[in-house]
Amino acid sequence: MTEGNFVDYTKIYVSSGKGGKGSTHLHREKFIEKGGPDGGDGGRGGHVYLVGEKSLWTLFHLKFARHVKAGHGGDGGSSRSTGSDGEDKYIEVPLGTVVRDKETNEILFEITEHGEKRIIAEGGKGGLGNWHFRSSTNQTPRYSQPGLPAQEADIVLELKVLADVGLVGFPNAGKSTLLSVLTSAKPKIADYPFTTLKPNLGIVAYRDYQSFVIADIPGIIEGAAEGKGLGHYFLRHIERNSTLLFLVPADADDIKKEYDILLDELRRYNPEMLDKDRLIVVSKCDMLDEELQVEMKKQLDKDFAGIPYLFISSIAQQGLVELKDKLWAMLNVEA
């Protein structure tokens, strides 16, 4: 998906460098009639690496980098001199990048840590020079090894946002507003569906200089698991979150029904998502008088037995401290 500078999916072709060939040079020196072999080895071809970079949050910088090629190894020289190694290429990617084989769709590896470095195309080994092939029966071998060929790969890079908490809800549930009051993030906010067309991340400052990361996942609609709307482009970002915050507005026609639809979309996309911790948050509680809120709590106790829920108002700044406390406790249950 692409929106502005946010790109979370791209395809690139990578090629390492081929190894340099070994030399067949024979030693030549004044007054020495028959010099022995002194051909050096070829240099290694350049590798292509993927490197995790925490300051990146998009694959936009690779949008037009369709072909990344490392340098070839240099040929061996005389006096057993080894050829130069080919130039390595480093492709920086954001944390949470999944690397797939384009043809088979097999996951090759994932980049999840800053500075993590993985070879995606290994440079060819340099060939051996003729010096290695001298023997008692062949004092002047005139052959050497060629360098090994380069490796090529068509790969798919797919970004899955790394966050502790994922905000899940229908379009216009108030997720962007909640993110803006909990964090310093400034997501686009307006009163129409699909205001958010990319995941927005924010850092929630907690007590004693602690913090956690929360992601506003673009609004899910019924049928998202089958690709309706923007489908799996949104849903895959939720896979990384350890805790899911289901945000449902207090003025929803049926809070339980909205929650069930959201949960069913996650289940159909990936049943393992149901193993994550869940918190139901009823937003816009400033619209409720005290009596109505009491009645609603009674109904929620029946509908969501065993699942924690909270009432908040982002606009009125109600229940936000309790929300932070609850999320922190859920994220640090084993601490």
Swiss-Prot record:
Transmembrane segments: none
Localization annotation: Cytoplasm
Family per record: Belongs to the TRAFAC class OBG-HflX-like GTPase superfamily. OBG GTPase family.
EC numbers: 3.6.5.-
Range of residues in the leader sequence: none
One record GO biological process: ribosome biogenesis
Summary of the function given for this chain in its UniProt record: An essential GTPase which binds GTP, GDP and possibly (p)ppGpp with moderate affinity, with high nucleotide exchange rates and a fairly low GTP hydrolysis rate. Plays a role in control of the cell cycle, stress response, ribosome biogenesis and in those bacteria that undergo differentiation, in morphogenesis control.
Main location: cytoplasm
GO terms, molecular function: GTP binding; GTPase activity; magnesium ion binding
Organism, scientific name: Flavobacterium psychrophilum (strain ATCC 49511 / DSM 21280 / CIP 103535 / JIP02/86)
Binding residues for GTP: 169-176, 194-198, 216-219, 283-286, 313-315
Record text on subunit structure and interactions: Monomer.
Protein name as it appears in the record: GTPase Obg
Chain positions recorded as Mg(2+) binding sites: 176, 196
This protein's record includes keyword Hydrolase: yes
The OBG-type G domain, residue ranges: 163-332
Domain Obg residue range list: 4-162
GO cellular component: cytoplasm
UniProt enzyme class: hydrolase
Key words of the record: Cytoplasm, GTP-binding, Hydrolase, Magnesium, Metal-binding, Nucleotide-binding
Cofactor(s) the protein requires to work: Mg(2+)
Keyword Cytoplasm: yes
